């Protein structure tokens, strides 16, 4: 069984801030969001976590191994470097979806995302070190089979993008609804899913669903570890094995 720790990062009162005292330039907002995501990715990544941009004003991180002090440092860094603040809510559970539901619900109980009085809330309890194991996190790294030959070198850039996004949307919904997993597009033709302990058959079914629904062919590498970094690197190596052997599901060390 997995034991995933998920942190919801929600920018405080961000919508109203973008139009106060008057609407801000879109290019400035996009620049702020991308820089903030990059800084968060670095800050959480140095502690072996993963963060996904999701909607930018609401980001989702896998934070196994990060304690409350580490979360507070992240908040302090945002406050010191940006004209906005962020609330963080930690949830844990046997599935990533359950962990996120808990984190989201706790933050919603503190007030609206656009509540001017709710600032830098820090909620939830991380998994105690004594309860952590080397198998707490399962990461699945999907990519599109021959994306370059099928899309990039054959279609215009936007058509390629829409095909890959259609595959991502189909996978995201299926993995969440069928397996309580959280899947994120991470650029190129890559999708990272944070999963409970799924079988090879579960992944094969997901790949078949995307093929049938979106006509996009996927393969996947799967890894497990004590942190998102450990599991993610295992998944990357497994994906390389799948590419070399022309298979659709491989696991790091055949876990």
Curated annotation (Swiss-Prot):
One of its GO terms (molecular function) is GTP cyclohydrolase IIa activity. The keyword Nucleotide-binding applies. It catalyses: GTP + 3 H2O = 2-amino-5-formylamino-6-(5-phospho-D-ribosylamino)pyrimidin-4(3H)-one + 2 phosphate + 2 H(+). One of its GO terms (biological process) is biosynthetic process. InterPro entries: GTP_CycHdrlase_3 (IPR007839), Nucleotide_cyclase (IPR029787), Rev_trsase/Diguanyl_cyclase (IPR043128). Its EC number is 3.5.4.29. Keywords: GTP-binding, Hydrolase, Nucleotide-binding. The keyword Nucleotide-binding applies. Pfam families: GCH_III (PF05165). It is an enzyme of class 3 (hydrolase). Catalyzes the formation of 2-amino-5-formylamino-6-ribofuranosylamino-4(3H)-pyrimidinone ribonucleotide monophosphate and inorganic phosphate from GTP. Also has an independent pyrophosphate phosphohydrolase activity. Belongs to the archaeal-type GTP cyclohydrolase family. This is GTP cyclohydrolase III 1. It comes from Halobacterium salinarum (strain ATCC 700922 / JCM 11081 / NRC-1).
């Amino acid at each position: 069984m997995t034991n995933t720790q998920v942190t919801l990062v929600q920018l405080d009162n961000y919508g109203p801030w973008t139009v106060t005292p008057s609407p801000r330039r879109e290019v400035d907002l996009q620049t702020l969001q991308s820089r903030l995501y990059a800084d968060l990715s670095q800050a959480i990544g140095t502690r072996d976590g993963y963060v996904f941009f999701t909607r930018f004003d609401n980001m989702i991180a896998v934070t196994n191994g990060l304690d409350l002090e580490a979360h507070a440092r992240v908040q302090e860094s945002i406050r010191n470097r940006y004209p906005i603040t962020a609330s963080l809510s930690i949830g844990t559970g046997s599935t990533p979806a359950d962990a996120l539901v808990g984190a989201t619900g706790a933050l919603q109980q503190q007030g609206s995302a656009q509540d001017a009085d709710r600032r830098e809330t820090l909620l939830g309890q991380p998994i105690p070190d004594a309860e952590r194991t080397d198998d707490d996190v399962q990461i699945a790294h999907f990519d599109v089979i021959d994306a370059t030959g099928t899309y990039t070198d054959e279609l215009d850039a936007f058509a390629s993008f829409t095909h890959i996004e259609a595959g991502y949307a189909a996978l995201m919904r299926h993995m969440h609804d069928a397996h309580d997993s959280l899947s994120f597009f991470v650029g190129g033709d890559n999708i990272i899913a944070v999963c409970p302990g799924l079988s090879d058959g579960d992944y094969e079914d997901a790949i078949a669903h995307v093929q049938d629904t979106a006509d996009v062919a996927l393969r996947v590498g799967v890894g497990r570890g004590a942190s998102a970094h450990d599991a993610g690197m295992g998944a990357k190596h497994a994906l390389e094995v799948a590419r070399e052997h022309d298979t659709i599901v491989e696991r790091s060390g055949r876990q």
